[in-house]
Amino acid sequence: MKHAAWPLAALLALSLLPPHASAQDTPLRFNFASQDKPGMQAVRWRADGGAPLYDAARGYGFVELTNAQPARPVHTATLRQDGKAVLVSEPAFDGDNHYGLAFRIKAAPGAYAIGVRTTAGSEDATVSISGMQTSRLLKASTWDAAGLLPNRTPMRVDGHQWSFRYVNGQPFIDVELEPNRTGTPVGIEEITLTPLPAEDRPAGSLPTVFTLGDSTVKSYTFDEAPMSGWGQVFPRLFDAARVKLVNYSNGGRSFRNAYAEGRFNDLLLAGRRGDIVMIQFGHNDESEDENARWGRGALETTYEHMIRNVYLPAVRARGMVPVLVTPMSRVNGTQKAGVPYENSFRKRHFPDIMRRIGQDSGVPVLDLNARSVEYYNRTGVPAVTAMVMSIEAGETPGKTNDGSYANGHPANKIDGTHFKEAMSKQYARLVAGEIERLAAGGDTTARQLGAMLRTDVRAAIQSGDWSGIYPEIAADIQDGDKAYYRNQFEKLVQLGVIQKDAQGKVDPQASMRTAEFTAALRRLLGLPAGALASYADGELTREAMGAILADAYHARFGTRPKYMTDYNGKTVVPGMPGYDPNLDSGAKGAMYYPLVDWSKLEDTAAVAPAYAARVRDAYQLGLIRSENGIVRGRMVNGTLLEPKTGVTRAKAAKALYFMWVLGQPPQAENHTLTTAAK
């Protein structure tokens, strides 16, 4: 499919991009042997027998502090040359710092193929480039939760030869070598840096907008439902015939560790000239581990250094276009009604730093931080709290890093940092609005981005009426107490199993009819038309709902889905597949199954005999739980089943959403609009 012509402003912006990746045009080759080698720069020891220290005028030499953040001490005084290589041996290590050596090479921003020949293999030595975490780069990995985005630029080791493609943003590159064992000499024989030019986009291919950020931007899977990131739903606002969007975000990431693990590097090597890179970090940068080698946290000076001296120069050197997004304010999970929301960045003022850098460097800044606080105060505490990760028992079979959500949030709090899809769509809308705001002010990059938005999205931004973009947002679930199950209603309306009335409402407090409930359940689980037909229509009661859920479950599932088994009371720990140190909370896994045994419920005798066995089955399967005494933000179960109580449309939506997630592939992205229909 041909895409529409770009506007003149976008073409002019492309014409101003740098002509190639780096001012360094020819390969740099360094020889650490005492004998000269053709075409290589000999690294000679000083007259006093010491190793040559870095000299910017000369363009190379050893350093005592690496360019990592924080800088890592290494050694120069103990380096020696044995005629074949430069060697280092360490009598002791300091935690994860194995010291070793760092050879600095003057190299302009741009991409390089780096080759390092060592005296020892990877069992004895580790090579790293400019503070990157080689242990992460040696493993086959993907950058996203669904496993759709593989790392295409790993560190490769072939015997004693190490190879890595690296995009540099600083005026030099550090080649680091650390011994893996004390008392074991390791060394470097040769280093080669070969410039890699920025690549043009193939003719006829679409431009790409990359999003890079933390858990608030990430694309989530069904096993993490209902959590969502704005980068996951952002593509919905764009014209797919004009642009593609790729989300490199993941939880636990900051400017520091997204760089160190190679995420940022791989994005830059995947991109082409003229592609746009939207970057949002700040929440994990608040972590108070700024002195840890592989930490997430940053002081304000480090945060500014990473943006100014690492990220922006590297993006530009690849001919790509940077856009900064200020991190949204965290929501206070205990916010009291009537008290205005305030910006959560009160200790480390990262959004202010990002705004200043944007102004100084001519980089557009989309101020999601400011817009988020405005949105919270317009919307009000009940609806905002409902849209963040406020989870009660029976709301979702998904999990967090601490275990199952099925009995409520395992952290026993309302998590105001993370949020449901109902909120991620609002953040995406606010980001799009910021694009149009900057475009109206004459920013050429914002105009380029704005031209890629859907025409109706641009109209919605101008009018303030988003009902055509998000028709699933019913008129009566947007604020107040009726917004409590807003996320569930939005998804069920999207899926076509709950209908809005002529006034655009879903009437959450009205009674649910049995026929509507069974029809919705059949469609969500892909059951045949005749399934659940034995239930007569009328106002749905909890005991009837329990029996229906049990019948639907057994009609759909031959074996228990992974939500009930793999994620039941388990926490991923080091050594297990999928373990990510950036997401390790140290907590024990929470259970999926009800915390209160069936025998401990106080009113089971009131269940009609015709329903009793199926209701018990549904309860023990975790498909229906007590609604009495449960609280969002706490892992708690009640002791009353209330079998004769009528089911509101809101409570029915809660149960239907739970069953929909239960029927989805755990590792599929959870914004997918799919039922289990076969």
Enumerate the predicted regions with their spans:
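Active-site-proximal beta-strand/loop segments in catalytic clefts of secreted hydrolases
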Residues: Q35, E178, L212-T216, Y220, ...
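Alpha-helical cap/lid subdomain in secreted, periplasmic
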Residues: N265-E421, K425, R429, G433-L438
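N-terminal propeptides
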Residues: G380, I461-K678
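Compositionally biased, intrinsically disordered or flexible polar/acidic segments
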Residues: Q24-Y220
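Sec-dependent signal peptide cleavage junction
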Residues: L17-Q24
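Bacterial N-terminal signal peptides
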Residues: P7-S15
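Bacterial N-terminal signal peptides that target proteins for export
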Residues: M1-P7
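Serine-esterase "nucleophile elbow" of acetyl-processing enzymes
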Residues: F32, P195-S249, F264-V277
